[in-house]
Curated annotation (Swiss-Prot):
Low complexity bias locations: 550-565, 777-793
Family: Belongs to the lst-2 family.
Stretch list, region Disordered: 339-395, 463-604, 662-688, 716-756, 770-834
Organism, as annotated: Culex quinquefasciatus
Cross-referenced SUPFAM superfamilies: FYVE/PHD zinc finger
Zinc finger map (FYVE-type): 845-905
GO cellular component, one term: early endosome membrane
Compositionally biased region (Gly residues): 592-602
Protein name: Lateral signaling target protein 2 homolog
Role of this protein: Negative regulator of epidermal growth factor receptor (EGFR) signaling.
Amino acids binding Zn(2+) 1: C851, C854, C875, C878
Polar residues composition bias: residue spans: 351-361, 463-475, 486-495, 568-580, 742-751, 816-826
Positions with biased composition (Acidic residues): 367-393, 501-516
Length: 907
């Protein structure tokens, strides 16, 4: 049976494709390719195309004949997105022939030797299938048949069926091995980890919708901004909210997904800082991650401000553990001095508060105090062996000059990540979160237990020398200052089992107790005695005091133990000139703890104390909460945005699934309206047509029925419908303004007059058509203009009953203008107020296998890029230009193709 060239059946198409492929292969074998390299290259390209066509038709035949008996290819889910192309089958066939001929994949000699027997089996099985299909084409072909009509009782048909099954199984096995050798393929464990990350993304999105960080409308419209917001919020949620999820940094590094494994150490440091944030600070950070707007706190808050700490090793709903000791964090203090030194006299009155020192850097916040003299702080740094004289306010202000932690803006392009994206082998330096001192202190605390005992003994000795152990009450009874208050953390402590946490001296839990904590505030003395109040502050990282009862002390003595490793000066001390009387005392009273503790529990408390001091050291480094939130934003956004480059295909697939899961269910379609009423109302735009932009409140007209219709241009308004207009013609022949036929309630301030009329001044923009003549029957101009009602008043007459809802546009008394000048001015105003156009639809990646400019095929190294102006798909070279697109509301430069760049910019 002859097979015609115009036959469209599967067997006929296979027959002609196979003949063309055989002809190209025969021509390649007829000459020496090294002698004619150009001809050889051209024929090899034709050979690859012929193989693609033959295998594509063979796959269609196997789909029809084998059906559900085809070999499973679920492993393709582990392949990178760039590998799954139409030409994959042809590449596999070409690779199998090369391996069967003795060639090897470059730098993959071992894998090539392993695959060579399978490659030979694949090529042999494929040759057998081609021969059987050619025979079937000549015996059982039905011209232009849409389906295969083979004789099931024929032995050749049964042989073809079994041969196709064998080839399909061998080809699937070879596909998995060959692709795994050529590119990095996910393991089963990694695939499951990424599924868990997808679940984390979905949980994060649902939480963001619940707390109001995002809106359901953004999800339904597939807002591109969510591509960045969801991964950023997921990092925060995975570190401090869903702590047992895929971002659990306490598990071994091998159990963390490859997406976040390079940032493991950075994520650990970010987690520790996130757990010190209050709920308000965490909300501000998440809002910043969504909007990139500047942080606006209600007041200038100190670093440790707040009674609630986010995180702490357990869920926020967990109950506190009353069996633990109480933990008091002294946030900021303010000390006053009544000094009668002859050399001082009367000096400017200041109140020094929140005095933090880190590596000889100070941040001083001064507040006026009407009753007190200058505060004095004589701070000593025994580690570095230098004294700082702070009696002179000039020295204090001079030392208060501190460089900003990060001078760049909040946007990622302005930030140099430098040490941000470091691997596990290179620890971060103090330019971001941790400092070398903290790392040394952490390693020292984890390695030397004897050092802890020495620290505690030194602290107890200092407290004894300073008179902290005395039970003499303070004689001051002045009201406490607002800037000085204790904060009790409510998080239990548990030792971390992670080796990395031990190296960095990090403990994942906090102390927690139901006990009360009291702090005696400094109070001015209005007596003839000369008293000097000295306030000692901790100079290294944090103000931290913990209630510990000394075994050698009396049962009634209440004191505070501060870690000497952090050089914590106690908040209770005496002045040399005060005769030993304590001028400031901080005490902590436990609710039910014993006064004595065993040596084992003391060692554990000491280790926990040092670890907590190390944890809070990173936060004290930042002088304000805004600096801390800014730094966390830079780090979190840097990690999340880096995923857009390293795992672009995986991230797109995850976010696509998240959008599908969390999008609103489709609303039931309304019955079609009658044709007569179809022209009365402007057509509501399809949500699918709105890619990025939504109408603002000023651009939405709300009818009495509650429906919202977005007006994007003047063409959507029917200004000539007399039945739909409630406005009369204003003086001067202006055209009637279109409005809803139903009565409308306008939420503005109205002033009523004696005759019952109401004058309403509004500031909205109404689109109307310009009149071409003086009479109502005159022809109207096609040009449209916008009338600003801020220059007019709407007078509603409520006295008459026959003209319900009638309103007139009355121009205010102003300088008379001609109609032409008014039209030109209003036309310019319309251009100003015009809504941005809807951006073009993006062509799906699957519909563009080649660049739409240079026709180059996309590969794992030549990626797709969309032009924001035309929506086309281009390679990086053809879409390297950038230009702002004001017509779409894009005021910043975005990616455009070369043709659109020339058209928009004109160069």
């Amino acid at each position: 049976m002859l097979v015609g060239a115009d036959d469209k059946s599967l067997l006929a198409r296979f027959y002609h494709a196979d003949r063309a492929l055989t002809a190209v292969a025969s021509e390649l074998d007829s000459f020496d390719g090294r002698a004619e390299p150009v001809r050889c290259t051209r024929l090899v390209g034709r050979l690859r195309q012929g193989q693609d066509r033959v295998l594509a038709i063979t796959n269609q035949i196997m789909d029809e004949l084998l059906g559900e008996d085809r070999a499973a290819r679920a492993f393709r889910a582990k392949f990178p997105e760039e590998v799954l192309q139409e030409s994959l089958a042809g590449q596999l066939w070409f690779g199998a022939e090369c391996l069967a001929a003795g060639s090897s994949i470059m730098n993959r000699e071992v894998e090539s030797a392993t695959m060579r027997p399978l490659a030979k089996a694949v090529t042999k099985s494929l040759d057998n299938v081609r021969n059987l299909l050619r025979e079937q084409c000549l015996r059982n072909n039905t011209p232009n048949s849409l389906t295969l009509r083979l004789d099931v009782n024929d032995a050749a048909t049964e042989q073809l069926y079994e041969s196709l099954k064998i080839f399909d199984r061998l080809f699937a096995e070879f596909e998995l091995l060959y692709v795994s050798a050529m590119v990095q393929v996910k393991s089963k464990q990694e695939y499951e980890m990424q599924e868990l990350i997808c679940v984390l993304f979905s949980e994060t999105l649902q939480r963001a919708l619940k707390v109001g960080l995002l809106e359901q409308e953004q999800v339904d419209s597939y807002d591109p901004a969510l591509m960045f917001s969801i991964p950023r919020l997921a990092i925060v949620a995975g570190l401090v909210i869903f702590k047992e999820g895929p971002l659990n940094m306490d598990q071994p590094a091998d159990d963390i997904s490859e997406m976040f494994r390079p940032f493991r150490k950075l994520l650990i440091k970010m987690r520790d800082l996130l757990r010190t944030l209050t709920k308000h600070e965490l909300y501000q950070l998440e809002k910043l991650l969504c909007t990139n707007e500047e942080i606006s706190l209600k007041e200038q808050q100190i670093i440790c401000d707040g009674n609630e700490i986010v995180g702490g090793g357990q869920s926020p709903s967990a109950a506190p553990n009353p069996a633990r000791d109480d933990t008091v964090v002294i946030v900021t203090t303010s000390a006053t001095v009544n000094s009668s030194d002859n050399l001082r006299g009367q000096e400017p009155q200041e109140d020094i508060s929140s005095f933090y020192t880190s590596n000889n850097r100070r941040t001083v916040d001064s507040e006026p105090n009407e009753d007190d003299d200058v505060s004095e702080s004589n701070d000593e740094d025994e580690d570095e062996g230098e004294e700082v004289d702070e009696d002179d306010p000039a020295n204090i202000l001079k030392d208060a000059l501190v460089t900003s932690d990060c001078a760049s803006g909040y946007l990622i392009p302005n930030t140099n990540f430098g040490n941000l994206l470091q691997t596990n082998e290179a620890p971060l330096t103090d330019s971001f979160i941790a400092t070398d001192e903290e790392l040394k202190l952490a390693s020292g605390a984890a390695s030397s237990h004897a050092r802890i005992e020495q620290i505690l003994s030194e602290s107890n000795q200092k407290l004894t020398d300073s008179g902290l152990g005395t039970a003499n009450p303070s004689l001051d009874h002045s009201p406490e200052l607002e800037t000085e208050r204790p904060v009790t953390s409510s998080h239990p402590i548990a030792q971390s089992s992670s080796s990395s946490s031990e190296e960095e001296g990090e403990v994942d839990e906090y102390d927690e107790d139901d006990s009360e904590s009291t702090l005696c505030e400094p109070k001015p003395h209005h007596t003839k005695h000369q008293r000097r109040h000295r306030h000692h502050h901790h100079h290294h990282r944090k103000h931290y005091s913990k209630h510990r009862s000394s075994a050698a002390g009396s049962a009634g003595t209440s004191g505070t133990t501060c870690s000497a490793a952090e050089r914590q000066i106690s908040s209770c001390d005496t002045s040399p000139s005060s005769g030993g009387l304590p001028s400031e005392c901080g005490s902590s009273t436990s609710g039910g703890s014993s006064g004595n503790s065993s040596g084992g529990s003391g060692d554990a408390d000491a280790a926990q104390e040092v670890a907590m001091a190390i944890r809070a050291a990173g936060r004290i480094k930042f002088k304000t909460t805004e600096n801390l939130l800014h730094r966390l934003f830079v780090c979190i956004a840097g990690v999340a945005d880096q995923l857009q480059t390293n795992f672009a295909a995986d991230l797109r697939q995850m976010l696509k699934s998240v959008f599908v899961i969390n999008s609103s269910p489709p609303e039931p379609e309304d019955p079609p309206e009658p044709a007569a009423n179809s022209t009365d109302k402007p057509k509501e735009p399809d949500p699918a047509d709105l890619f990025e932009f939504r109408a603002s409140e000023q651009d939405v007209i709300t009818n009495s029925g509650g429906s919202s219709q977005s007006i994007y241009s003047a063409e959507e308004v029917n200004a000539e419908d007399p039945h739909d207009s409630v406005f009369g013609s204003p003086p001067g022949g202006a055209s009637p303004v279109r409005a809803s036929s139903a009565p409308r309630t306008m939420m503005t301030t109205a002033a009523s007059s004696e005759n019952g009329s109401v004058t309403v001044n509004v500031s909205v923009s109404v689109v109307t058509a310009g009149s071409g003549g003086s009479g109502s029957g005159s022809s109207r101009s096609s040009q449209e203009r916008s009338v600003s009602l801020s220059e007019t008043s709407i007078v509603v007459d409520g006295s008459g009953g026959n003209t319900e809802g009638t309103a007139l546009l009355v121009p205010r008394e102003s300088t008379p203008k001609s109609v032409q000048s008014e039209q030109s001015g209003q036309r310019g105003m319309m251009e100003e107020r015009r809504m941005p156009e809807a951006p073009p639809r993006w062509i799906p990646d699957g519909d563009a296998p080649r660049c739409m400019a240079c026709a180059s095929s996309f590969t794992p190294f030549r990626r797709r890029h969309h032009c924001r102006n035309c929506g086309g798909v281009f390679c990086g070279g053809c879409s390297s230009a950038s230009a702002p697109l004001p017509k779409y509301g894009l005021t910043k430069a975005v990616r455009v193709c070369r043709e659109c760049f020339v058209r928009e910019v004109g160069v």
